[in-house]
UniProtKB/Swiss-Prot annotation:
Component of the eukaryotic translation initiation factor 3 (eIF-3) complex, which is involved in protein synthesis of a specialized repertoire of mRNAs and, together with other initiation factors, stimulates binding of mRNA and methionyl-tRNAi to the 40S ribosome. The eIF-3 complex specifically targets and initiates translation of a subset of mRNAs involved in cell proliferation. WD repeats lie at residues 8-47, 50-89, 150-190, 192-233, 289-328. SUPFAM superfamilies: WD40 repeat-like. Belongs to the eIF-3 subunit I family. It is found in: Cytoplasm. GO terms for biological process: formation of cytoplasmic translation initiation complex. It comes from the Eukaryota. GO terms for cellular component: eukaryotic 43S preinitiation complex; eukaryotic 48S preinitiation complex; eukaryotic translation initiation factor 3 complex, eIF3m. Component of the eukaryotic translation initiation factor 3 (eIF-3) complex. This is Eukaryotic translation initiation factor 3 subunit I.
Length: 347
């Protein structure tokens, strides 16, 4: 896979995302700017420039009309994608670590950091829209605030489950916790990692999700039961993991801590994206290129490409080639042959 290298940031990338159609890539960075790119050729579409500090997180709504960013400058902003203008800005009590639109686009999920005397929390706001579906305002008072549960440390990441039924959070001590999306009521918590959880990404139907942790393990977890379905063990701390549509794979990204990078070669630092089989849990390939840790990996909803954002300030956009789609285990090939024979008998 020959990548398209996107250079639009002066500092490390913090998050990379595709829109629902998979034709645009959204990225944010520690240089206080977010960028938008065409996924097909890597051409730069524009920038979102109004923050005064690190942008930790970015999201885009289902219709690619609005983008949402949150950062270290104690605020989150809503942008018109077509114009690149920030139409709403809301101040927060502490830096914003993660932002996300709810699946139906009616609410915002905001994760606040545990600094400045704030214990860390997840805040949910409702959006006020007009009859044309345009966002008129963000409700002044949040719908509810989920403070860090007593038996856990601060929340690093959070995301909505299917239909916005649950909010799933990943904690600094390796726990995951669930809350009802309607009112923020606590549902359950479970410790599945030994170190902090850096990322949570959902399957296309949002019924299960993958966590990535600094303990070098990624876990596939059922939303309703918190049963750990699969585990993927890497040889380096992980920052991000994503589930691929079309093929039964997961992609993991990470590497040695950024503070140790200057004394380490790229090979020793493990600065590669790793592709694992989702069912059999085997590593089936690696993609090199970054010369620093991978801070985020995201797979296109179309399943035809993935993007990685690195500590080196580059976004590497990979379009999967034929060998990726042709790869099958012997058991998969056998199953397909048997299934074809059964269908022929039925005819």
């Amino acid at each position: 896979m020959r990548p398209i290298v996107l250079k639009g940031h002066e500092r490390p990338l913090t998050q990379v995302k595709f829109n629902r159609d998979g034709d645009l890539v959204f990225a944010c960075s520690k240089d206080s700017v977010a960028s938008i790119w065409y996924a097909i050729n890597g051409e730069r579409l524009g920038t979102l420039d109004d923050h005064s500090g690190t942008i930790w997180s970015i999201d885009v709504d289902e219709s690619t009309t609005y983008a949402l960013t949150g950062g270290a400058d104690f605020c989150f902003k809503i942008w018109k994608v077509a114009t690149g203008v920030a139409v709403h800005s809301v101040s927060t009590r502490s830096p914003v670590l993660r932002v996300e639109f709810s699946p139906d686009g009616s609410k915002l999920l905001i994760v606040l950091d545990a600094v400045m005397g704030h214990i860390g929390s997840i805040v949910v706001y409702s959006l006020i829209r007009n009859e044309n579906g345009e966002i008129v305002n963000v409700k002044e008072e949040p719908d509810y605030e989920i403070t860090t549960i007593e038996q856990a440390t601060k929340v690093f990441v959070a995301s909505w489950s299917y239909n916005g039924k649950y909010i799933i959070a990943g904690h600094e001590d390796g726990q995951i916790s669930a809350y009802y999306g309607e009112n923020g009521e606590f549902v359950q918590a479970k410790k599945i990692h030994e170190k902090s959880i850096k990322d949570i990404q959902f399957s296309p139907d949002r019924t299960y999700f993958i966590t990535s942790s600094r303990d070098s393990v990624a876990s596939l977890v059922d939303v309703d039961t918190f049963e750990v379905l699969k585990t993927y063990k890497a040889d380096c701390p992980l920052n991000s993991a994503s589930i691929t549509p079309l093929k039964e794979f997961v992609i993991l990204g990470g590497g040695q801590d950024a503070k140790d990078v200057t004394t380490t070669s790229a090979r020793e630092g493990k600065f590669e994206a790793r592709i694992y089989h989702k069912v059999f849990q085997d590593e089936i390939g690696r993609v090199k290129g970054h010369f620093g840790p991978l801070n985020y990996v995201a797979v296109s909803p179309t399943g035809t490409s993935y993007a990685s954002g690195g500590e080196d300030g580059y976004i590497r956009l990979h379009h999967f080639d034929k060998s990726y789609f042709d790869f099958k285990y012997d058991v998969e090939k056998t199953f397909e042959v048997e299934r074809r024979q059964q269908l022929q008998k039925q005819e």
